[in-house]
Curated annotation (Swiss-Prot):
Organism taxonomic ancestry: Eukaryota, Fungi, Dikarya, Ascomycota, Saccharomycotina
Signal peptide feature range: none
Family that this chain belongs to: Belongs to the RRG9 family.
Protein name in the entry: Required for respiratory growth protein 9, mitochondrial
Region (Disordered): 53-72, 186-224
Bias (Polar residues) ranges: 186-200
Annotated organelle transit peptide span: 1-42
Record organism: Zygosaccharomyces rouxii (strain ATCC 2623 / CBS 732 / NBRC 1130 / NCYC 568 / NRRL Y-229)
Amino acid sequence: MIPFTSGKCYDRFPSMLFTYRVVIGRSFCQAHRGSLMAENRSKGAKNAIKVVHESSLTSKEQREKSKDDETPAWKIQKMAISKKLKGQRWNPSKRLSREEMEGLRLIKSQFPHLNASELGQQFKVSPEVVKRILSSKWRPTEDELGKLQDRWKQRGERIKQMFDSHQIQEKPLVVPKRIVINTLGSSPSVVATTRPSKNAKSNKRTKNKLHLLQQREHDHEHSE
């Protein structure tokens, strides 16, 4: 305990006043000391929990944690997807069109012995998708079918206009001349000669054939 009085108090104050003062001082010091101890106790508990958490991580985990803080968000998402797929290739589920759904129902009605897995392999979807399509009772009305057909017709017209406006004109390919560099036996100088391409030979042959046909027809007319 901390002493609260000195020798001068015995000379100046009576004994009753002295005892009253000592009791008040002791109670005040005990209350102040208790609050300080409680505050220190709470801080010590927080520090202890922090130390336990830091000590529970190994050096490797701490390095990985620092790397995760530095890696960008897109890379973290890509790593999470690869971890979820377990190294397999990303293959999102395929959605069937209305025509394909109607075709699936028609095949099932004509061949009832086919199961969901076989139909799923045919349409490249999971058996659960096939079961949901076959169990659904929704059918489009005539108005909805008419709207769908009009929409597909407008889509085809837009695509046709787009191709007509951006039509690519095919240009003939220019075949470069083949240059052969060789040396003559008599002179040491280098000589560059051009070799005709295969297309040029084929063109000459076609021209010669046409010329022969025209000449034969001309001779036949004169002979008659």
